[in-house]
Amino acid sequence: MTATITITNPILSGMNPDPSWIWDDEFQRIVLVTSTFELVPGLPIYVSEDMTCWKHVSNVIDADLARRLLIPFVDDSGGVYAPTLRRIHGKYVIACTIARLDDRRAMEGGCTESELMRFHAAEGNFILEADSIEGPWRGPFWIEGAEGIDPDIFEDGDGNVYWTQTRPAVNPQWEGQTEVWTQRINPETWTFVDDGLPAGSGK
């Protein structure tokens, strides 16, 4: 018979919004990441074997990666929103969005036009990847053609990888309508493979 345990909430106290977690089968543990907005270091990684005892093992974003993500140039309460953590083709992968970038501050702070173009072509959506949760983390890989916020990344049984997120509806039937869309993505180049398809429109 499987032993039962008692979980006392909150399992993580303090500011830990938008949690995303995986069961890391290789190491028989839960790995969890949360939002940190404009704070650096950012995207803390926690691990647990039993859902009750948690250990903070690393932060994904250091000062150098924060600069590459343009975090110093976001407005208050901007920055990294709603990370999604997955194992994709054996790598640890985080899909996320940078919100509320101030272009003027970015340019004044030394950001190049090409950096801003890549950022806006991806609407602030990016991938980070690593071979270990302790890092180092590679990226950002800006996802050109991504639309919206709150991305998810998924690998199916055949090894195909899909990017899914919410965006304003292409043909809205009411003000503020959104839709979920999905598109296959190449996990080696982090570029889209084919045309995206709406998966749902909130009807």
What function would you assign to each model-found segment?
Residues M1-K203:
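Carbohydrate-active catalytic/glycan-binding domains of CAZyme proteins
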